[in-house]
């Protein structure tokens, strides 16, 4: 159609008849006509009469629908409607032309055609409707707007009002420009025409988008989906429960049927009390032995909301109560604990079925569910509510070492820590059966693992291992690259065990438990998570170099413990290789852990675990006291002692006697000559005389072990009560002149204390005093170099006072420094590094 046409609208119909087809659309059956994208020639203006228009219109209709061909009712209806539509289009064009000519504007005309109902989906995606060109100025583009009708209805949309034709053209051009600018070629559905006939709206004008949506369905967008609560959900569609690789949620998470190979005791299997869901305790509740009372720091992994809920002190036994016997602890009410625990390191753990004292099943569950809700308890709770609120405000005054002890007490409940260290620590295995399936449920779950895999970048081998143990062969089947959920769950469905090596990096609740326990043990507390499918075993029998606490979270798992193969393996300093079953004697412990149970065994204990036929297993292994033996201390101490003795004693610098080589050595080991005996005796006396470590040397060696802890430790979890008192809650601003305005000011009247009991260590190295601290450590193990700051020798006394006065607050003016300005400077430097906490918030 000519771009510069200014005649009446009659020429528009003439151009439709004489001009080239604009698109490859149309309802006529037959081979497709390829779309001609070449520039169209200008048609000369022509003057026609209305009669000629009607004749040409009939020709066009007959061309589209051949009268001689056999036509069904749908084709006849479409032909009739198309004829009516084109007739109305001609009339509308005539009126638009006369109106536009009077105003000096060029008319706009649009035409559409419907697609055949029998067209295929691929043809529908590629079809575009023929449209007449608009009479625009020479500077406008001649690109045509495409409009695809829905194949679900034979009706033709009503004609748009002529007065809004130009606005409609502008809107469509904007849509095309936006579509071209979108790199993903995604567009919103076109706005519904108010004048169009009711029915399904038009299909997408981009056939590629239409095909993509048809093929991909709901999985076009695969990024994590955020729910109403803000938590991410896996976008993958899980299979049905019958075929899903994840185990189905059982009605009872803690089946109490005894294991066939390891029958349970009456104490363990008779009481089947219902375990209440662990409630979340209020943040202001004080003296709760766990992170729920303290809360999770908003600044540390705020995206993961896996904070645990730990019990109140009312649910834990008194410090003077008796502990159950060694080997197995089952807190069944109404039984006595008269049996004495075995303390022999080589003796087999006692299998007596003794249990802890308890008044009822409800009191047994108190450690997991918090205070009971009986009427007397409610009265007592209401009466002490005001007192609890007052105490919660002073929670920042607690001792971090005692808080770590309370976490250990929560894990071992009803066993008291003192009894545990006296009877079991490094001596014997200890099993706690509490029949509370939800006891550790908030630490880890399938949902947390799935969310962790989606949200974070975990790598196989670095963060996750896929293992199997079949027919005596242990294999690690780690793929390369990132551990995405489909790959992990596919391996799990194939019967492989999944080991997560550093879950505390990603789960705030588990990290909080580890960070609090490390204050008590003064060593790195590691955590591994093991997910094992039913009737599977992931690891061969072996022993480790750590004190292990196994926390059964879900399912059941049968554990077998064996005596060390060699006496030198007891309290091993390094982990072993894999043992064959034939190398092991009969197990000294063969029991099934159920959800909520705990098993402790010392380092060097050979162990293996397997799931039952119809039960999966999810458990956490907390590892403590790795490389914390006297041997590690002496490895640091004796080189230091020898170096100092050589510098001080000339006798150690003298040369060896000439006859040493003829009397000492492997070849002379059987000799008992006098020269040999004199040489051996002289060396032994020299060691006893010159290589006795001094107090200062022992202190320096211990500082080196403590320095290693500062490098390995997890960063502390900053609680809300602590945040407002530390640099982590500080915010700075600028004034009108651009000067920085801090919201804190430490004076000599400010009361301060250390953030944690073991937050820093004063170490003398190469004649320099350094403060090593772990507050800035990464969540990954030793990702960065150790953090330290150097201080002057005159400032060491101030650090010592802060260490000795903990957990009490002291005024900055009390620090033993020569001037008030120096005291303020030292306190400010420590506070700005996150090592100090003020008694009162600055805000």
Swiss-Prot record:
It is an enzyme of class 1 (oxidoreductase). The modification Phosphothreonine is found at residues 222, 335. Residues 1-299, 311-397 are annotated as: Disordered. Residues 502-641 form the JmjC domain. Keywords: Chromatin regulator, Dioxygenase, Iron, Metal-binding, Nucleus, Oxidoreductase, Phosphoprotein, Repressor, Transcription, Transcription regulation. The modification Phosphoserine is found at residue 336. Transmembrane segments: none annotated. Its EC number is 1.14.11.-, 1.14.11.27. One of its GO terms (biological process) is negative regulation of DNA-templated transcription. Its main location: nucleus. InterPro entries: JmjC_dom, NO66-like, RIOX1/NO66-like_C_WH. It catalyses: N(6),N(6)-dimethyl-L-lysyl(36)-[histone H3] + 2 2-oxoglutarate + 2 O2 = L-lysyl(36)-[histone H3] + 2 formaldehyde + 2 succinate + 2 CO2. It is found in: Nucleus. Binds 1 Fe(2+) ion per subunit. Residues 167-179, 378-397 have a biased composition (Basic and acidic residues). Its cofactor is Fe(2+). Fe cation binds at residues 542, 544, 607. GO terms for cellular component: nucleolus; nucleus. Pfam families: JmjC_2, RIOX1_C_WH. Belongs to the ROX family. NO66 subfamily. Oxygenase that can act as both a histone lysine demethylase and a ribosomal histidine hydroxylase. Specifically demethylates 'Lys-4' (H3K4me) and 'Lys-36' (H3K36me) of histone H3, thereby playing a central role in histone code. This is Bifunctional lysine-specific demethylase and histidyl-hydroxylase NO66. It comes from Drosophila ananassae.
